[in-house]
Amino acid sequence: MKPTPKAVVIFSGGQDSTTCLFLAIKEFGKENVEVVTFQYGQRHAIELDKARWIAQDLGVKQTLIDTSVIKAITTNALMDDQAEIKQTGNTPNTFVDGRNALFLLYTAIYAKSQGIQTIYTGVCETDFSGYPDCRDVFIKSMNVTLNLAMDYNFNIRTPLMYLTKKETWALADQLGAFDYIRTHTHTCYLGVEGGCHTCPSCLLREKGLNEYLEEKGNV
């Protein structure tokens, strides 16, 4: 008898990863979905509380992995409370070198230990933030690398890769999770409850939300 397929979601408690979680639950069933959350020294630590609450509320197993050692070898505005968030060249200073590679590697190690092949991550290159590790070419490359490194058939899914934020809100609505995601998820880089309305992450989220609500109101 074949084992029941399962999935693991790289989960921050934000809009994108929570949308992926609802997608995974819809396809695999709540009892067959887990989430992995990373503590990497992020200044918006409130997201860890949100992730914990959402996982408990939806009844999915959460594994917390501490990768904060990365603070000893790199610096950026996402991990420095005193840094001003700004664009530096083509890449914003909120970019954490190696973060998504690290997340995927650790998640894959965990997934294999649990007999899980499907990994969801909410990366997206449409509303491009300038993060090189959010590009489809990187994810595909990492998928091949992990399969070779562990001799295992991982399937990394990126359902939001080519969606705008407006389309991501629309997807949440289709999943019956619009109000839940709007109310309970955290996106703000500065860690402000309800959003600061000024950081790039808040502005992108609010722009997409307003565009979707305007479109929905005109239908």
Curated annotation (Swiss-Prot):
Job description of the protein? Catalyzes the ATP-dependent conversion of 7-carboxy-7-deazaguanine (CDG) to 7-cyano-7-deazaguanine (preQ(0)).
Q: Where is the signal peptide?
A: none
Cysteine-cysteine disulfides: none
Q: What class of enzyme is it?
A: ligase
Task: Mention one GO biological process in which this protein takes part, according to its record.
Answer: queuosine biosynthetic process
Tell me its family: Belongs to the QueC family.
- The EC designation for this entry is 6.3.4.20
Q: Does the keyword Magnesium apply?
A: no
User: What is the designated name of this protein?
Assistant: 7-cyano-7-deazaguanine synthase
Q: Kindly state which keywords UniProt assigns to this record, in alphabetical order.
A: ATP-binding, Ligase, Metal-binding, Nucleotide-binding, Queuosine biosynthesis, Zinc
Organism for this UniProt entry: Glaesserella parasuis serovar 5 (strain SH0165) (Haemophilus parasuis)
Q: Which reaction does it catalyse?
A: 7-carboxy-7-deazaguanine + NH4(+) + ATP = 7-cyano-7-deazaguanine + ADP + phosphate + H2O + H(+)
Organism taxonomic ancestry? Bacteria, Pseudomonadati, Pseudomonadota, Gammaproteobacteria, Pasteurellales
Q: Which InterPro entries match?
A: QueC, Rossmann-like_a/b/a_fold
Top-level taxonomic group:
Bacteria
Which prosthetic group or cofactor does it need?
A: Zn(2+)
Which residues hold ATP? F11, S12, G13, G14, Q15, D16, S17, T18, T19, C20, L21
Work out whether the entry's keyword set contains Hydrolase: no
Task: Report the cofactor remark.
Answer: Binds 1 zinc ion per subunit.
Chain positions recorded as Zn(2+) binding sites: C188, C196, C199, C202
The Gene Ontology terms for molecular function here are:
ATP binding; ligase activity, forming carbon-nitrogen bonds; zinc ion binding
User: What pathway annotation does it carry?
Assistant: Purine metabolism; 7-cyano-7-deazaguanine biosynthesis
